[in-house]
Amino acid sequence: MPATEPEEGDVHTVERTFTHEDVECFGEVSGDRQAIHTEPDDEGRLMVQGLLTATLPTAIGGDLGVLARTMEYEFREPVYTGETITCEVTVTTTTERDDRYEITCAVDCRNEDGTTVMRSGFEGVIWKDEW
């Protein structure tokens, strides 16, 4: 059994400030080495790959033991190195089964100005015997 059972309305938060090294490493792994990710802008920043930003909710899902079934992303604004991004995952539905919890979550990632840079959602399971 999980330490605490997931409940509708539960909110989990993580913050991260992406670095040049993060963007460069992700570019190597993903193959996304477009100029906007490799050449600094006039302020010396790199644009963070969208899927690198999308790792924020997966960090929370990993902490909760979620095995994702579906994920959707809407990238609304660019994210740059040096910006602190706050990711909030809200459990919107939860169904208890004999061996698992089935959950649906909404995700909102905001920059330091409070602007939503990414919205997302996912469905997944938390197996009871994993805890």
Language model feature labels by segment:
Residues 76-87, 108, 118-119:
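Extended hydrophobic secondary-structure segments
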Residues 1-8, 90-131:
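HotDog/MaoC-like acyl-thioester-processing domains
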Residues 13-15, 72, 119-123:
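Well-ordered beta-strand positions in beta-sheet-rich domains
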Residues 11, 52, 84-86, 90:
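Residue-level marker of beta-strand positions
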Residues 1-68, 131:
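Hot-dog-fold acyl-thioester-processing enzymes
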Residues 70-84, 92-98:
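Active-site beta-strand->loop segment that positions catalytic residues and contacts the acyl thioester
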